[in-house]
Each structure stands twice: as structure tokens, then as C-alpha cells.
């Protein structure tokens, strides 16, 4: 069964894709379950972004009905994790019209991670430690999200990938994040977008996936992070084989905020 658990359309600020075009592309690629997960990032400055939930849900429900015999459409959202804004993040994620929420670290100290890391020079270790410490705080304190998105998202945006700190230097804080994820039954996302953003791996990298398995983690979903119809489901054949080789036995997705597990065959 092919499931793409993370895609974007024109309700996100960084996509212009028509939702129906995404659906048609998914059907063409024999994807049985397609999740729309458009961006919401709540920060205390001009980066703050939220879309019209009512319009989004109305449009997607119409498409869901139109294509119900060909594909299962899930209505999700990628919520930017930011513990300082939990007062608005958590009520939004209580909306039961959504099938699920991905929690992702797009900002740190109310600043865009991608822009910040591109400007930085020197040793990035302190930034990495702070990034994962804040991720730990978010997982511990934020209620209502079901999937932890592209954990090592920060890796994508170093201009010189050789400057990514050695994993052993921040392994302990990543382990703390993963232990909390496991305890809270949050699903870890494997996002093939990393392969297409200058990395030789999906997000998260194998160091994190192997640590997750070593700690007893089993729940994982597979996502393209597509912002264009042509990118839906890309890299999935290789990704599925890779996850199986690492010992994962099933994929998890959410419908009506309830987990559904399917064999990873």
C-alpha cells in the first residue's frame, strides 16, 4: 500500500499547486492514500502564518468525495512547533475536522531555521544542540500532534554539507527526543525530501533512524514533502526498501486522529 503522508498545495505559502492536480498525480502513481498537510507557523513576528481552515476543509472534502473511488484523501496540517506559542497552537490542533497534525521544527527562537543556518559560519554544534533541545521541549510540552516531521530538517540548509556536526556530538539530546516520542506514541516521519535538497539521505538520517530502532521505536510514516504534483511519492520505492532493511515492519498513518498500521511490504 502506497501512502504519502506529507504534501503541500496552494494553502501553503511556498506552494502554488492546485489540490486537484496533486490528487491526479497521486492516482497516476498508484498512491492509495494522500495526505494534504499545509503549513501553519505561529511565531511572534512577521513570519507568523496561518491559512483559512474553513476554506481548506471545504475544498478538500469536495475533492475527497469526487475521488473517493480512486484514492483516500486525508486532511492534515503541518504545524510549526514553537512552545512559546502553544496557547494558539494547541487549540488549533484540537480541531477534529483534521485527520492528523505533523509537528515540525521550522523556527527556533521565533526565527526561520533555514534562513538562519544559511547565514551562519563556523561551528554549528551550539545551534544543533539548541535546535534539538527546543524540539525536546516541544515534544514534552505540546499536545495534539501525531507525527514528528523531518527531525533533522536543519541538515538541509547548511550550504556546505561537510559542516554538519558529527552525530555523536549531539546524540544524547536526540535520544532524549526519541524517548519522549516513543513514550507519547508519536510517529516519526521518514521524509524523502532530503534526497532532493542536497543530502545523500532522507530525513531523518540513518543515525537517527537506527537510534530510534535501538530505543524500541517502531512507528514510522513515509512522506514526500511534495510542493509540486510531480514530486508526490518520489523516492518511495527505494525508501520503502531502506526502511525494511532497518527493521521497520509497518507504516502508520492517521484517519480521524486514529492510527492505522499497514504492513511495509
What are these regions (language model features)?
Residues 1-88, 92-95, 99, 157, ...:
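An N-terminally biased module of ancient metal coordination in phosphate/nucleic-acid-related enzymes
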Residues 114-127, 155-166:
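Surface-exposed cleft-lining segments at the edges of enzyme active sites
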Residues 150-159, 185:
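Active-site rim beta-loop-alpha module in soluble metabolic enzymes
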Amino acid at each position: 500500500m502506497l501512502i504519502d503522508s506529507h504534501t503541500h498545495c496552494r494553502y501553503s505559502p511556498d506552494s502554488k499547486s492546485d489540490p486537484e492536480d496533486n490528487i491526479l498525480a497521486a492516482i497516476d502513481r498508484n498512491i492509495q492514500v494522500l495526505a494534504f498537510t499545509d503549513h501553519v507557523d505561529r511565531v511572534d513576528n512577521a513570519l507568523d502564518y496561518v491559512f483559512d481552515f474553513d476554506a481548506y476543509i471545504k475544498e478538500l472534502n469536495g475533492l475527497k468525495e469526487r475521488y473517493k473511488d480512486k484514492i483516500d484523501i486525508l486532511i492534515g496540517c503541518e504545524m510549526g512547533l514553537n512552545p512559546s506559542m502553544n496557547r494558539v497552537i494547541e487549540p488549533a490542533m484540537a480541531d477534529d475536522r483534521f485527520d492528523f497534525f505533523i509537528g515540525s521544527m521550522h523556527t527556533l527562537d521565533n526565527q526561520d531555521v533555514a534562513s538562519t543556518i544559511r547565514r551562519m559560519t563556523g561551528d554549528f554544534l551550539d545551534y544543533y544542540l539548541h535546535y534539538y533541545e527546543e524540539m525536546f521541549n516541544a515534544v514534552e510540552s505540546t499536545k495534539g500532534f501525531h507525527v514528528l516531521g523531518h527531525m533533522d530538517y536543519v541538515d538541509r540548509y547548511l550550504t556546505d554539507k561537510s559542516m554538519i556536526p558529527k552525530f555523536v556530538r549531539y546524540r544524547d539530546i536526540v535520544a532524549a527526543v526519541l524517548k519522549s516520542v516513543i513514550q507519547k506514541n508519536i510517529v516519526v516521519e521518514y521524509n524523502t525530501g532530503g534526497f532532493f535538497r542536497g543530502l545523500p539521505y532522507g530525513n531523518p538520517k540513518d543515525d537517527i533512524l537506527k537510534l530510534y530502532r535501538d530505543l524500541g521505536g517502531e512507528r514510522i510514516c513515509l512522506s514526500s514533502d511534495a510542493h509540486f504534483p510531480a514530486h508526490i511519492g518520489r523516492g518511495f520505492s527505494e525508501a520503502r526498501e531502506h526502511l525494511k532493511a532497518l527493521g521497520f515492519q509497518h507504516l502508520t498513518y492517521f484517519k480521524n486522529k486514529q492510527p492505522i498500521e499497514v504492513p511495509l511490504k
